[in-house]
């Protein structure tokens, strides 16, 4: 992931780049440096105007991290964009751990000099180094830059606890794992390696405190849900197996950081849904096109039961999921593969999608409260839409449907999407235990699938992540808020079967 100061620098000067970049020359260099590939180039060239092509180049560089920033700086120098290169120079090949960035007004002399060298209107940060940093030779190879950037990203990990009021595991609970205090976190990527062993979660004393145990999940040992099935208000989910679950786990990328810790997510989810009665299929490290083909084949599979689960663990941005080839795929295109038109075997059946990926670069600093409250905050409560609410449509609902044999149903119905975070924000992942969101999903579902429908479960997940997890970046305490989008027409229960029962 690109450092925030570098990303902000590109964002502030986007108008300069969209006015002066020579598209063909820059693309040629970036493809030669393997920052972009030919598919990226075709996508950029398909943009309608030259200005849009220039903007898309900058956006593509932002998606590809610090290595791409340095390569972009080299490309500007080598193609005669001296003024634009001057904009990036203060942060090019800089070691973040030895520098403090801040915005400050230039002296008049410096301002006149920089205006003469660069296009008018750009802004560039000033850097003050704590220690002297040796300059990088202009003849440094791209591989050297890449290796140094990768090691630099490791040194920039945020050292903090990811859980609010977190209780440490018992001694030797994880003999092969780093302690919680030494775990590292980054938005969308974390550093270190995770164990492949399955874990389950149990609640410690006091609110929002959790302890991890190395034991199989035992959520199905409890009695099944006691309420009577009502076909008018509940989806049927009694087939054996309950259905199919596809888990796409992208860990290693061509340019973007490795998603260390995602193996723990995959193992825990595999264990969870197998115990819930699903046939689990895992696919690792898929390209953008590979994801689409895999989901398409999954949607058309002949062995579906009463419901279907799709889990995507990858890098992402708003409305896109990124494959291991760094190609972004529209989430709308993914969800369309699951609709009734493209997946007729899943028509009228609930399809639950979990997306563990960043949806932007913003970080949630939270807000102060007087005390801890378990209730849902008022700003999360949704009101009725005045135009599409029940009163507005009342007359249309009660009119008699004379001589109608078929009634139409939206093809996009019966889908629920659970996002790890809200739009434009990062999601967080622990290098040893996996992502906050998936940890909460496994804990809540293993405890309450027997007596809650999926919307209730995900509301509880929202509360667990919002109240039970946090990390720090300097003096800032950072939080995360999951989000769900429901197109379900009935309540959906997993109906887990009881095991180890005396009956």
Curated annotation (Swiss-Prot):
UniProt keyword terms in alphabetical order: Apoptosis, Autocatalytic cleavage, Cytoplasm, Hydrolase, Membrane, Mitochondrion, Nucleus, Protease, Synapse, Thiol protease, Zymogen
Any GO MF annotation of the entry: endopeptidase activity
Boundaries of every CARD domain copy: 1-91
Protein activity control: Octameric ced-4 activates zymogen autoprocessing and enhances activity of processed ced-3. Zymogen autoactivation is inhibited by csp-3. csp-3 has no effect on active ced-3. Zymogen autoactivation is inhibited by csp-2. Inhibited by cysteine protease inhibitor iodoacetic acid (CH3COOI). Inhibited by benzyloxycarbonyl-DEVD-fluoro-methyl ketone (zDEVD-fmk). Inhibited by benzyloxycarbonyl-VAD-fluoro-methyl ketone (zVAD-fmk).
PROSITE patterns, per the entry: CARD, CASPASE_CYS, CASPASE_HIS, CASPASE_P10, CASPASE_P20
Taxonomic superkingdom: Eukaryota
Catalytic activity entry: Strict requirement for an Asp residue at position P1 and has a preferred cleavage sequence of Asp-Glu-Val-Asp-|-
Effect of residue 7 to D: Reduces interaction with ced-4. Lack of activation by the ced-4 apoptosome
Biased composition, class Polar residues, residue ranges: 166-179
Region of interest called Required for interaction with ced-4, as start-end residue ranges on this chain: 389-404
Residues the record marks as site: Cleavage: 221-222, 374-375, 388-389
Region (Disordered): 106-129, 150-179
Post-translational modification: Autocatalytic cleavage removes the propeptide and generates the catalytic subunit p17 and two non-catalytic subunits p15 and p13; autoproteolysis is induced by ced-4 oligomer. Cleaved by caspase csp-1 probably at Asp-144 and Asp-374.
Function comment: Acts as a cysteine protease in controlling programmed cell death (apoptosis) by proteolytically activating or inactivating a wide range of substrates. Component of the egl-1, ced-9, ced-4 and ced-3 apoptotic signaling cascade required for the initiation of programmed cell death in cells fated to die during embryonic and postembryonic development. During oogenesis, required for germline apoptosis downstream of ced-9 and ced-4 but independently of egl-1.
Protein name: Cell death protein 3
């Amino acid at each position: 992931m690109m450092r925030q100061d570098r990303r902000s620098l590109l964002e502030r000067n986007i108008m300069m780049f969209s006015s002066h970049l020579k598209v063909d020359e820059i693309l040629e260099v970036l493809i030669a440096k393997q920052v972009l590939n030919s598919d990226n180039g075709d996508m950029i060239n398909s943009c309608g105007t030259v200005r849009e092509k220039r903007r898309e180049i900058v956006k593509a560089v932002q998606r590809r991290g610090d290595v791409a920033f340095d390569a972009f700086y080299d490309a500007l120098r080598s193609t005669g964009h001296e003024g634009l290169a001057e904009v990036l120079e203060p942060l090019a090949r800089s070691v973040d751990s030895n520098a403090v960035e801040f915005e400050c007004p230039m002296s008049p002399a410096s301002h006149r000099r920089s205006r003469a060298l660069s296009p008018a209107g750009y802004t560039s940060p000033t850097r003050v180094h704590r220690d002297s940093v040796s300059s990088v030779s202009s003849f440094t190879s791209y591989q050297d830059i890449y290796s140094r950037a990768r090691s630099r990203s490791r040194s920039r990990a945020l050292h903090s606890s990811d859980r609010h009021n977190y209780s440490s595991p018992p001694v030797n609970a994880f003999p092969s794992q780093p302690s919680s205090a030494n775990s590292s976190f980054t938005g969308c990527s974390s550093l270190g390696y995770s164990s492949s062993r399955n874990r389950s979660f149990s609640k410690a004393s006091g609110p929002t405190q959790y302890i991890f145990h190395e034991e199989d999940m035992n959520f199905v040992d409890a009695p099944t849900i006691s309420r009577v099935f009502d076909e008018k208000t509940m989806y049927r989910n009694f087939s054996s197996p309950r259905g199919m679950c596809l888990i796409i786990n992208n860990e290693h990328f061509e340019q973007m950081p490795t998603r260390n810790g995602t193996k723990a997510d995959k193992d825990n989810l595999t264990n969870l849904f197998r115990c819930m009665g699903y046939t689990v299929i895992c696919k690792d490290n898929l390209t953008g096109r590979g994801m689409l083909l895999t989901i398409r084949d999954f949607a058309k599979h002949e062995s579906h039961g009463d419901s279907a689960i799709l889990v995507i663990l990858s890098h992402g941005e708003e409305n896109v999921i990124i494959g291991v080839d760094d190609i972004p795929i529209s989430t709308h295109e993914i969800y369309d593969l699951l609709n009734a038109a493209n997946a007729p075997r899943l028509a009228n059946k609930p399809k639950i999608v979990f997306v563990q990926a960043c949806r932007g670069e913003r970080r949630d600093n939270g807000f102060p409260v007087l005390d801890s409250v378990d209730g849902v905050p008022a700003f999360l409560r949704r009101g009725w839409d005045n135009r599409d609410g029940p009163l507005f449509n009342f007359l249309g609902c009660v009119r008699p449907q004379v001589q109608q044999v078929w009634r139409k149903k939206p093809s996009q119905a019966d889908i629920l999407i659970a996002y790890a975070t809200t739009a434009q924000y990062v999601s967080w992942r622990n290098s040893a235990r996996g992502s906050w969101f998936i940890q909460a999903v496994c804990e809540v579902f293993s405890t309450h699938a027997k007596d809650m429908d999926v919307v209730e479960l995900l509301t509880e997940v929202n509360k667990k992540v919002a109240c039970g997890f946090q990390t720090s970046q300097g003096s800032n305490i950072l939080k995360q808020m999951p989000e769900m989008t429901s197109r379900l027409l009935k309540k959906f229960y997993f109906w887990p079967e009881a095991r180890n029962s005396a009956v």
